[in-house]
C-alpha cells in the first residue's frame, strides 16, 4: 500500500527547454516529444489577413523589367519615366542607399502588368507566386518599343522630305528661268521679288486681334466717337432752335393778319370776298388812318388852348 501511495504522489511542475509548463509528471518522455512536434499554425485575423491578401495581389500584378543603365540616369528619373516609386526600385534591386545605384550596369524596374509600358509586350505564361519568381523580359523584347518609334519617325521624316521635293519640282516647272541675257534674268528676279514684297507687308500689317472689333481701326473708332458725342448733339440743338424760330415767325404773321383784317373797312372786305385785290382801298385806308391819328394828336392841344 505504501508503494502504491508513493507512485501516486504528484511531483512539482517541471519547466522544459521548449518553454511549456507541465503540471503533471506522470507523462512519459515519448508523450512530451509528440506534443513538442505538433505545431499549430494560427489563423491571421483582422488587418493582418487583409495585408497578406493585398500583398499577394500586388505581387501578382507586378512585372519586373530590366533596363541597361546609361549616362545621366538616376533613380528619380527612372521612377518618373516608368511611373513607380524609388522605394520599390530599391526593394527589387536590394539597394541600401542611392549610391549603390551607380555600381549597377542594369536595374530591375517593377511595373504593373496591364499598363501602357507592357501592353505591346507579350504577357507572361502562368501565374506568379512569389516576388523572386516574377518574369524578367530580355533585352531583345525591350528593344521592340524604341525600334517601333524609330521606324515611325523615319517614315514621317521620309514622307515630309518627299513632299518637299514635290513642291520644289512644281516651283521649278512653273518658273521659266531660261533667258538669253543676264539683264533678262535680273529683270525676272526683280519682278518676282516685287511680287513677294506686298504679300509679306500684308502679313506683317495684319492685326493679330482681327475680328474682335469687327475689323475697324483705332482711327475709325475715334471718328465714330466724335460723331456720336459732338456732331449729333450739335445738329440736334440747331434743329430745335430752327423749329422754335419758325413757330415764332408763324405766330407773328398770324397776329398781323388778324390785326389787318380788323382795320380794313367793310367795302374793302367785300372786294376781298369777291376776289378783287383792294389796292386803292388799302391806300385810302392808310390815308384815313393817318388823318385819324393826326386829329387825335391835335385834339388834346386844342383843349389846352381853350
Curated annotation (Swiss-Prot):
Kindly report every residue range on the membrane side named Extracellular.
1-217
Q: Which residues form the LysM domain?
A: 65-109
Short name of one Pfam family for this protein?
A: LysM
Q: Which domain of life is it from?
A: Eukaryota
Recorded GO MF terms: peptidoglycan binding
Task: Write out the annotated subcellular location.
Answer: Cell membrane; Golgi apparatus
Which GO biological process entries does UniProt record here? Answer: Golgi organization
Which residues are on the Cytoplasmic side of the membrane? 239-306
Question: Where do transmembrane segments lie in this chain?
Answer: 218-238
* Protein's recorded name: LysM and putative peptidoglycan-binding domain-containing protein 3
The coding gene here is LYSMD3
Amino acid at each position: 500500500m505504501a508503494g502504491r501511495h508513493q507512485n501516486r504522489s504528484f511531483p512539482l511542475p517541471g519547466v522544459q527547454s521548449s518553454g511549456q509548463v507541465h503540471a503533471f509528471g506522470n507523462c512519459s518522455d515519448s508523450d512530451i516529444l509528440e506534443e513538442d512536434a505538433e505545431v499549430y499554425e494560427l489563423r491571421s485575423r483582422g488587418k493582418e489577413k487583409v495585408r497578406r491578401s493585398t500583398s499577394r495581389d500586388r505581387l501578382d500584378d507586378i512585372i519586373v523589367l530590366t533596363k541597361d543603365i546609361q549616362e545621366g540616369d538616376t533613380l528619380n528619373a527612372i521612377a518618373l519615366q516608368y511611373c513607380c516609386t524609388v522605394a520599390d526600385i530599391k526593394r527589387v534591386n536590394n539597394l541600401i542607399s542611392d549610391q549603390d545605384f551607380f555600381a549597377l550596369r542594369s536595374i530591375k524596374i517593377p511595373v504593373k502588368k496591364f499598363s501602357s509600358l507592357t501592353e505591346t509586350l507579350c504577357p507572361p505564361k502562368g501565374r506568379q507566386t512569389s516576388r523572386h519568381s516574377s518574369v524578367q523580359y530580355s533585352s531583345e523584347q525591350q528593344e521592340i518599343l524604341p525600334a517601333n518609334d524609330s521606324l515611325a519617325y523615319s517614315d514621317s521624316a521620309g514622307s515630309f522630305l518627299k513632299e518637299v521635293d514635290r513642291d520644289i519640282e512644281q516651283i521649278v516647272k512653273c518658273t521659266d528661268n531660261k533667258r538669253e541675257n543676264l539683264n533678262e534674268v535680273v529683270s525676272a528676279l526683280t519682278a518676282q521679288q516685287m511680287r513677294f514684297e506686298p504679300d509679306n507687308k500684308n502679313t506683317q500689317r495684319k492685326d493679330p486681334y482681327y475680328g474682335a472689333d469687327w475689323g475697324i481701326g483705332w482711327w475709325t473708332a475715334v471718328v465714330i466717337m466724335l460723331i456720336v458725342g459732338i456732331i449729333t448733339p450739335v445738329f440736334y440743338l440747331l434743329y430745335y432752335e430752327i423749329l422754335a424760330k419758325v413757330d415764332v415767325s408763324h405766330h407773328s404773321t398770324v397776329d398781323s393778319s388778324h390785326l389787318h383784317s380788323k382795320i380794313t373797312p367793310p367795302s374793302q372786305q367785300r372786294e376781298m370776298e369777291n376776289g378783287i385785290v383792294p389796292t386803292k382801298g388799302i391806300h385810302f385806308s392808310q390815308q384815313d388812318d393817318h388823318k385819324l391819328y393826326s386829329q387825335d394828336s391835335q385834339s388834346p392841344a386844342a383843349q389846352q388852348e381853350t
